[in-house]
């Protein structure tokens, strides 16, 4: 008897934002005390961001991941002990090691010995994590995966650099992906080009207990914008081709929530109406690997995304990395 084809399917979503919501005006007032000039109008015009959330000093990335994961597990209706794969996409882990995924596994009380590891692809990290989990499930190695994007980017921001500190926020989003005979994830595409590593990076490193170089995020905004608008349409089209779908068959586009101008540019190039694009950058800022699952959960919980609809996620991040996935919700 022929063995049925395995797919991976989204069972549930969850997200969490730390309670400290910082508006542009509040951030502007804080920066003014340091002699840094900016304004709500300047930030909104260039990014579309109105507010972001910052984690308290004693809250870690794994803490944010835990709250988002609990909500995704509840929404999926699965037993945590059935989760045999945990992948956390983050660039701001609790420690150099152990991985945030292992810390999360322990905090969830999962004792089944399943695999747990981090993926570091910055803002495209969740697309990388979803494609990786999908491959593991399709191969039969794992059946139920918890994939999380979680960040505390406020820890690596230089609040004397107005071009970067106004952009980012903290948060976490999670998805339960499970083996299914029904198609779920339909196609993915991942790429990287390390020759662009210097345009978005934290150039410092720890050498024998001493930080060598700057530990703060550095970004060449114009170079990032130019690269992003060039690669995002291409990787989205590639993922759609693998899914045997045309852009007009996509019900919802969930781009990495980096900058409203980049997002609308990609949406327009794909020929999709703006109404089909999920936007949370205005209230969350850029939460790096957390942005896509945060936006996905928001659109699921408010009823926009319905079962059976096609969703396209795409993102680009430091490395440089970029990726996209298409799935039927």
Swiss-Prot record:
Query: Does Phosphoprotein appear among the keywords?
Result: no
Chief subcellular location: cytoplasm
The answer, when asked if Lipid biosynthesis is one of the entry's keywords, is yes
Q: What protein family is recorded?
A: Belongs to the thiolase-like superfamily. FabH family.
Instruction: Extract the HAMAP family matched here.
Output: FabH
One term of GO molecular function: beta-ketoacyl-acyl-carrier-protein synthase III activity
* Residue span of region ACP-binding: 257-261
Annotated GO biological processes are: fatty acid biosynthetic process; secondary metabolite biosynthetic process
Its biological purpose: Catalyzes the condensation reaction of fatty acid synthesis by the addition to an acyl acceptor of two carbons from malonyl-ACP. Catalyzes the first condensation reaction which initiates fatty acid synthesis and may therefore play a role in governing the total rate of fatty acid production. Possesses both acetoacetyl-ACP synthase and acetyl transacylase activities. Its substrate specificity determines the biosynthesis of branched-chain and/or straight-chain of fatty acids.
- Compartment list: Cytoplasm
Q: In which organism is this protein found?
A: Burkholderia cenocepacia (strain HI2424)
- Quick one: which pathway? Lipid metabolism; fatty acid biosynthesis
Q: Which gene encodes it?
A: fabH
Q: What class of enzyme is it?
A: transferase
Protein name per UniProt: Beta-ketoacyl-[acyl-carrier-protein] synthase III
Signal sequence, renumbered to the chain: none
The record's keywords, sorted A to Z, are: Acyltransferase, Cytoplasm, Fatty acid biosynthesis, Fatty acid metabolism, Lipid biosynthesis, Lipid metabolism, Multifunctional enzyme, Transferase
Listed EC numbers: 2.3.1.180
Q: How does it assemble?
A: Homodimer.
Task: Supply the domain comment.
Answer: The last Arg residue of the ACP-binding site is essential for the weak association between ACP/AcpP and FabH.
Q: Which GO terms describe its cellular component?
A: cytoplasm
Q: Which InterPro entries match?
A: ACP_syn_III_C (IPR013747), ACP_syn_III_N (IPR013751), FabH (IPR004655), Thiolase-like (IPR016039)
What Gene3D superfamilies is this protein classified in?
Answer: 3.40.47.10
Catalysed transformations (reactions)? malonyl-[ACP] + acetyl-CoA + H(+) = 3-oxobutanoyl-[ACP] + CO2 + CoA
